[in-house]
């Protein structure tokens, strides 16, 4: 859905790589996505400690959200769904994109109230 919107930019692989570095853990990663095929065809997601949530939840949204709330750390997309998954969890770290909307760098869109102070924002 973000591929065709005028409001949000899809996040690049580089954002997720920076997020993993920021979390700095060797633990397993669970990927929540609505584009599993793209992820499976991308070499970045072929590491042995990566799992896809749909393998556990059958892509049922409420089950995805419940599983998200059980995760210790989060690297979220600029989406309401991943935001709520992180917000409702008892997370140690949440990595969020610095720029949530297209053209945030040069516009009047304010996102100060969108990201809690304890979350870490990184360039995207």
Which residues are covered by each model-predicted region?
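Residues at the C-termini of beta-strands that transition into short coil/loop
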Residues: 54-56, 98, 118, 123
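Short, glycine/charged-enriched secondary-structure capping and boundary segments
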Residues: 44-47, 89-91, 109-111
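Low-complexity, compositionally biased segments
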Residues: 4, 37-38, 67, 116, ...
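Intrinsically disordered regions, especially transient/low-confidence alpha-helical propensity segments
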Residues: 12, 35, 80-81, 97, ...
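Core catalytic architecture of nucleotide-activated donor-dependent transferases building glycoconjugates
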Residues: 1-59
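Leloir-type glycosyltransferase catalytic cores
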Residues: 104-124
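A donor-sugar binding/catalytic signature common to diverse glycosyltransferases
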Residues: 61-107
């Amino acid at each position: 859905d973000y591929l065709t919107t005028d409001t949000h930019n899809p996040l690049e692989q580089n954002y997720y790589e920076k997020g993993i570095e920021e979390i700095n853990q060797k633990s397993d990663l669970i990927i929540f996505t609505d584009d599993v095929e793209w992820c499976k065809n991308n070499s970045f997601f072929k590491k042995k400690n990566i799992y896809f949530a749909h393998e556990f939840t059958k892509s049922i949204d409420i089950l995805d959200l419940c599983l998200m709330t059980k995760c210790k750390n989060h690297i979220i997309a600029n989406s309401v769904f991943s935001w709520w998954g992180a917000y409702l969890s008892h997370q140690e770290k949440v990595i969020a994109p610095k720029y949530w909307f297209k053209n945030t760098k040069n516009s009047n869109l304010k996102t100060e109230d969108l990201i809690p102070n304890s979350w870490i924002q990184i360039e995207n």
